[in-house]
Amino acid sequence: LLGFAPAKLIHDQTEVARSHAPRFALIAGGRPDQARALEADGVTSYLHVPSPRLLTMFLEQGATRFVLEGRECGGHVGPLSSFVLWDTMVSTLLATVKDSAQAGGIHILFAGGVHDALSAAMVATIAAPLAERGIKVGVLAGTAYLFSKEIVDTGAVVRGFQNAALACDTTVTLETGPGHASRAATSPFADAFLARRREL
C-alpha cells in the first residue's frame, strides 16, 4: 500500500486488501496509525522508513515492524543507498532500543539489492548487532522474486511484465513528485514519461 496516496484511494485499497485477508502488509510512505489499523484486523504490517528521524518518531509512536529499503531497490526508491541506510538505521536502533522486552517486539526487514548469497551475507553481517540485542531481522528479496516461476503462476505479475524485467539491462528512475520516484525498466513508456516531464 502507498500510505501517502489520497485518503479515498488508501481507504479503497485497504478495503480490497482486507477482503482477501492477507497475512502481511507493506506500507510505503505510511504512518504508524495506518499500520495499527491493519494490525487490529490481524494483518501484520510493516512500514517503510527511509530515514533515522522517521524511524525514531515511528518507534516513539509505537510502531514495531519496519522495512529498511535502500535506493538499489526496484519500485519506489528512497533517498539513501542500501549500505548507508542500513548502517545508519542499525546505529539508530542500537542507540534507541535498550530494553530487551522492547527489542524482542521489533522486526526489521532489509531490502534494496538483496539478490544472492553474497548480498544476503552482507545483510547478516550488518544486522548481527540487532539480532544480538533481540530484534528480529529478515530480508525482502523482491527482485529475486520477480524472476521466479511462482510470481507468474500465482498471478502476482503477468508474464509480459516478467519478460520485460528479464530482457532489461538498464533502469531509469521516474520521479512523479518531490521525494516520490520509482525504478523502471528502460522502455518506450519510460522514454515517453521522461520526454513529457521535460516538456512540462
Residue ranges of predicted features:
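A short, small-residue-rich loop immediately preceding and capping a beta-strand
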Residues: 106-112
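Generic enzyme active-site microenvironment
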Residues: 67, 111, 140
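Active-site entrance/lid segments in N-terminal catalytic domains of soluble metabolic enzymes
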Residues: 1-102
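Conserved acidic functional residues
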Residues: 48, 112-113
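Conserved active-site-proximal phosphate/metal-binding subdomains
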Residues: 85-86, 90-104, 115-200
